[in-house]
């Protein structure tokens, strides 16, 4: 396997050819915050939390979609980057109604965990709280609460790339973006949903939840994505 050398925060390291900066950083013991990225799904660079500084680059680069190159000099936790990440989290908090005390994902929310990690306990921006559709609990097993959505599209990618149903999609832009089911159908009336639950498991917040879960009862498992994708690539199952 071909290997490249690069410098991360002043320390020389190495990584396989073709990996992203995010993968290279993690392989060298440097963790970067992410919300939209999830191993097993195609990276899209949407949340902008994994931005890094690369010497010679004219702008900050999203590590999850930038390929690591030989000789790169990368900074991951400068004062500028930390300010950007905190501001990004504050903007996410201001766009929707993120009230942790009444959320089913309280204690298992990736957004809240990152806020705690980076010291974000409020938003300096005006709370927008757009006029959103009501909570959809028409599905037999799952619920959809638009108030918690951060537009990471993990659920959409899991439904499309892993399950192959493409039941979920996103409409609108910015604060007006929201998840839709089968082109504006209720989730319970969907003809394409297989009820597999992959979308609920990959959701980083309380947007998608198991019906019957009360506050702080959500437990999600995302490791299955890497297992499924790896099995398909290796043709471990004859029916795939």
Regions from the language model: what does each represent?
Residues 48, 57-192, 201, 206-240:
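Fe-S ferredoxin-like electron-transfer domains
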């Amino acid at each position: 396997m071909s290997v490249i050398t690069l410098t991360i925060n002043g320390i020389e390291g190495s990584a396989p050819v073709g990996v992203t900066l995010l993968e290279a950083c993690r392989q060298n013991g440097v963790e970067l915050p992410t919300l939209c990225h999830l191993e097993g799904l195609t990276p899209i660079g949407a949340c902008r939390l994994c931005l890094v500084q690369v010497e010679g680059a004219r702008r900050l680069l999203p590590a999850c979609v930038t390929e690591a190159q030989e000789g790169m000099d990368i900074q991951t936790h400068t004062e500028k980057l930390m300010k950007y990440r905190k501001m990004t989290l504050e903007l996410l908090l201001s766009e929707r109604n993120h009230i942790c005390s009444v959320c089913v994902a309280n204690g298992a929310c990736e957004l809240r965990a990152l806020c705690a990690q980076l010291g974000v306990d409020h938003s300096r921006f005006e709370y927008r709280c757009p006029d959103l559709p009501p909570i959809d609990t028409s599905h037999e097993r799952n619920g959809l609460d638009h108030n918690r959505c951060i537009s990471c599209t993990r659920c959409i990618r899991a439904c499309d790339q892993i399950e192959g149903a493409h039941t979920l999609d996103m409409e609108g832009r910015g604060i007006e973006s929201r998840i839709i089911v089968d082109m504006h159908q209720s989730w319970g009336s969907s003809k394409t949903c297989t009820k597999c639950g992959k979308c609920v498991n990959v959701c980083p917040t309380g947007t998608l939840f198991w019906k019957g879960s009360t506050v702080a009862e959500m437990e999600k498992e995302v490791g299955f994505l890497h297992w499924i994708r790896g099995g398909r690539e290796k043709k471990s199952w004859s029916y795939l």
